[in-house]
Curated annotation (Swiss-Prot):
Keywords: Cytoplasm, Protein biosynthesis. This is Ribosome-recycling factor. One of its GO terms (biological process) is cytoplasmic translational termination. The lineage of its organism: Bacteria, Pseudomonadati, Pseudomonadota, Gammaproteobacteria, Alteromonadales. It is found in: Cytoplasm. It comes from Shewanella woodyi (strain ATCC 51908 / MS32). Its main location: cytoplasm.
Length: 185
Protein backbone atom coordinates (compact mmCIF):
# COMPACT_ATOMS: atom_id res chain seq x y z
CA UNK A 1 0.00 0.00 0.00
CA UNK A 2 2.84 2.41 0.82
CA UNK A 3 4.47 1.74 -2.54
CA UNK A 4 1.19 2.55 -4.30
CA UNK A 5 0.93 5.86 -2.44
CA UNK A 6 4.53 6.75 -3.34
CA UNK A 7 4.06 5.72 -6.98
CA UNK A 8 0.84 7.75 -7.21
CA UNK A 9 2.57 10.77 -5.66
CA UNK A 10 5.46 10.53 -8.11
CA UNK A 11 3.09 10.22 -11.10
CA UNK A 12 1.07 13.22 -9.94
CA UNK A 13 4.24 15.26 -9.40
CA UNK A 14 5.40 14.36 -12.93
CA UNK A 15 2.07 15.65 -14.24
CA UNK A 16 2.51 18.89 -12.27
CA UNK A 17 5.92 19.42 -13.88
CA UNK A 18 4.50 18.71 -17.35
CA UNK A 19 1.61 21.12 -16.76
CA UNK A 20 4.07 23.81 -15.66
CA UNK A 21 6.17 23.18 -18.77
CA UNK A 22 3.05 23.48 -20.95
CA UNK A 23 1.98 26.73 -19.28
CA UNK A 24 5.45 28.22 -19.74
CA UNK A 25 5.52 27.21 -23.42
CA UNK A 26 2.51 29.48 -23.97
CA UNK A 27 4.50 32.53 -22.82
CA UNK A 28 5.82 34.32 -25.88
CA UNK A 29 9.55 34.80 -26.16
CA UNK A 30 11.37 36.57 -28.97
CA UNK A 31 11.48 33.34 -30.99
CA UNK A 32 8.77 31.81 -33.13
CA UNK A 33 7.42 28.53 -31.79
CA UNK A 34 4.27 26.69 -32.96
CA UNK A 35 3.09 26.05 -29.37
CA UNK A 36 2.64 29.81 -29.05
CA UNK A 37 -0.67 29.51 -30.91
CA UNK A 38 -1.90 26.37 -29.08
CA UNK A 39 -4.28 28.33 -26.88
CA UNK A 40 -6.05 30.00 -29.83
CA UNK A 41 -9.52 28.71 -30.69
CA UNK A 42 -11.21 29.45 -34.02
CA UNK A 43 -14.99 29.45 -34.59
CA UNK A 44 -15.56 26.58 -37.02
CA UNK A 45 -19.10 25.48 -37.96
CA UNK A 46 -20.56 26.86 -34.76
CA UNK A 47 -18.00 25.55 -32.26
CA UNK A 48 -14.63 26.77 -31.06
CA UNK A 49 -11.90 24.56 -32.52
CA UNK A 50 -8.18 24.64 -31.65
CA UNK A 51 -6.13 26.37 -34.35
CA UNK A 52 -3.96 23.29 -34.89
CA UNK A 53 -7.09 21.38 -36.00
CA UNK A 54 -7.97 23.85 -38.77
CA UNK A 55 -4.44 24.32 -40.12
CA UNK A 56 -0.74 23.49 -39.90
CA UNK A 57 1.39 25.85 -37.83
CA UNK A 58 5.05 25.90 -38.84
CA UNK A 59 8.10 28.09 -38.31
CA UNK A 60 9.02 30.15 -41.35
CA UNK A 61 12.03 31.84 -39.76
CA UNK A 62 13.14 32.77 -36.24
CA UNK A 63 10.55 35.54 -35.95
CA UNK A 64 7.72 34.35 -38.22
CA UNK A 65 5.12 31.60 -37.96
CA UNK A 66 3.31 30.32 -41.05
CA UNK A 67 -0.19 28.84 -40.88
CA UNK A 68 -1.50 26.75 -43.77
CA UNK A 69 -5.27 26.63 -43.29
CA UNK A 70 -6.96 23.46 -44.57
CA UNK A 71 -10.15 25.29 -45.62
CA UNK A 72 -9.41 28.60 -47.38
CA UNK A 73 -12.77 30.03 -46.28
CA UNK A 74 -11.43 29.89 -42.70
CA UNK A 75 -8.58 32.38 -43.32
CA UNK A 76 -10.49 35.49 -42.11
CA UNK A 77 -11.74 33.65 -39.00
CA UNK A 78 -8.21 32.44 -38.16
CA UNK A 79 -6.79 35.95 -38.61
CA UNK A 80 -9.51 37.42 -36.39
CA UNK A 81 -8.91 34.77 -33.69
CA UNK A 82 -5.17 35.52 -33.66
CA UNK A 83 -5.74 39.28 -33.51
CA UNK A 84 -8.29 39.00 -30.70
CA UNK A 85 -5.97 36.79 -28.61
CA UNK A 86 -3.95 38.44 -25.86
CA UNK A 87 -0.65 37.58 -27.57
CA UNK A 88 -0.33 40.94 -29.33
CA UNK A 89 0.21 39.40 -32.78
CA UNK A 90 -0.79 40.85 -36.15
CA UNK A 91 -1.31 38.15 -38.83
CA UNK A 92 -1.01 38.84 -42.58
CA UNK A 93 -2.56 36.58 -45.18
CA UNK A 94 -0.71 35.74 -48.37
CA UNK A 95 -2.93 33.50 -50.47
CA UNK A 96 -3.61 30.24 -48.64
CA UNK A 97 -0.94 30.96 -46.01
CA UNK A 98 -1.18 33.24 -43.01
CA UNK A 99 2.11 34.70 -41.81
CA UNK A 100 2.39 35.80 -38.18
CA UNK A 101 5.45 37.98 -37.57
CA UNK A 102 6.53 38.18 -33.94
CA UNK A 103 7.47 41.71 -32.92
CA UNK A 104 10.62 42.14 -30.86
CA UNK A 105 9.95 42.25 -27.13
CA UNK A 106 10.57 45.51 -25.30
CA UNK A 107 12.53 45.49 -22.04
CA UNK A 108 9.36 46.32 -20.11
CA UNK A 109 7.42 43.50 -21.78
CA UNK A 110 10.26 41.05 -21.04
CA UNK A 111 10.11 41.94 -17.35
CA UNK A 112 6.32 41.49 -17.33
CA UNK A 113 6.69 38.08 -18.99
CA UNK A 114 9.33 37.05 -16.45
CA UNK A 115 6.83 37.87 -13.69
CA UNK A 116 4.24 35.70 -15.45
CA UNK A 117 6.73 32.84 -15.84
CA UNK A 118 7.76 33.06 -12.17
CA UNK A 119 4.09 32.95 -11.14
CA UNK A 120 3.57 29.83 -13.28
CA UNK A 121 6.64 28.21 -11.68
CA UNK A 122 5.31 29.03 -8.21
CA UNK A 123 1.94 27.49 -9.14
CA UNK A 124 3.80 24.35 -10.22
CA UNK A 125 5.74 24.24 -6.94
CA UNK A 126 2.51 24.66 -4.97
CA UNK A 127 0.89 21.81 -6.92
CA UNK A 128 3.88 19.54 -6.17
CA UNK A 129 3.71 20.44 -2.47
CA UNK A 130 -0.02 19.70 -2.44
CA UNK A 131 0.71 16.24 -3.83
CA UNK A 132 3.30 15.76 -1.05
CA UNK A 133 0.73 16.80 1.57
CA UNK A 134 -1.86 14.37 0.15
CA UNK A 135 0.65 11.49 0.08
CA UNK A 136 1.78 12.18 3.65
CA UNK A 137 -1.80 12.34 4.92
CA UNK A 138 -2.57 9.03 3.15
CA UNK A 139 0.44 7.43 4.84
CA UNK A 140 -0.60 8.77 8.25
CA UNK A 141 -4.11 7.42 7.69
CA UNK A 142 -2.58 3.98 7.12
CA UNK A 143 -0.68 4.32 10.39
CA UNK A 144 -3.89 5.18 12.24
CA UNK A 145 -5.52 2.08 10.77
CA UNK A 146 -2.50 0.10 12.05
CA UNK A 147 -1.59 -1.03 8.51
CA UNK A 148 1.98 0.24 8.83
CA UNK A 149 4.49 1.12 11.55
CA UNK A 150 5.75 4.53 12.61
CA UNK A 151 9.13 3.73 11.01
CA UNK A 152 7.38 2.99 7.70
CA UNK A 153 5.61 6.34 7.95
CA UNK A 154 8.86 8.25 8.47
CA UNK A 155 10.61 6.33 5.70
CA UNK A 156 7.74 7.02 3.29
CA UNK A 157 7.62 10.70 4.23
CA UNK A 158 11.37 10.97 3.59
CA UNK A 159 10.99 9.35 0.16
CA UNK A 160 8.05 11.59 -0.74
CA UNK A 161 10.12 14.60 0.37
CA UNK A 162 12.95 13.47 -1.95
CA UNK A 163 10.45 13.22 -4.84
CA UNK A 164 9.17 16.69 -3.95
CA UNK A 165 12.66 18.20 -3.87
CA UNK A 166 13.56 16.60 -7.21
CA UNK A 167 10.39 17.84 -8.91
CA UNK A 168 10.72 21.36 -7.51
CA UNK A 169 14.33 21.38 -8.76
CA UNK A 170 13.03 20.40 -12.23
CA UNK A 171 10.53 23.28 -12.15
CA UNK A 172 13.32 25.67 -11.08
CA UNK A 173 15.48 24.47 -14.02
CA UNK A 174 12.59 25.00 -16.46
CA UNK A 175 12.09 28.49 -14.99
CA UNK A 176 15.78 29.37 -15.31
CA UNK A 177 15.83 28.23 -18.96
CA UNK A 178 12.68 30.23 -19.76
CA UNK A 179 14.03 33.36 -18.03
CA UNK A 180 17.29 33.07 -19.99
CA UNK A 181 15.29 32.67 -23.21
CA UNK A 182 13.21 35.75 -22.37
CA UNK A 183 16.25 37.92 -21.62
CA UNK A 184 17.96 37.09 -24.93
CA UNK A 185 17.81 40.08 -27.26
Amino acid sequence: MLNEIKKDAQDRMDKCVEATKTQMAKVRTGRAHPSLLDSIKVPYYGSLTPLKQVGNVSIEDSRTLAISVFDSTMIPAVEKAIMSSDLGLNPMSAGATIRVPLPALTEERRKDLIKVVRAEAENGRIAVRNVRRDANSDVKALEKEKECTEDDVHRSEDEVQKFTDAHIKLIDEILAAKEAELMEV
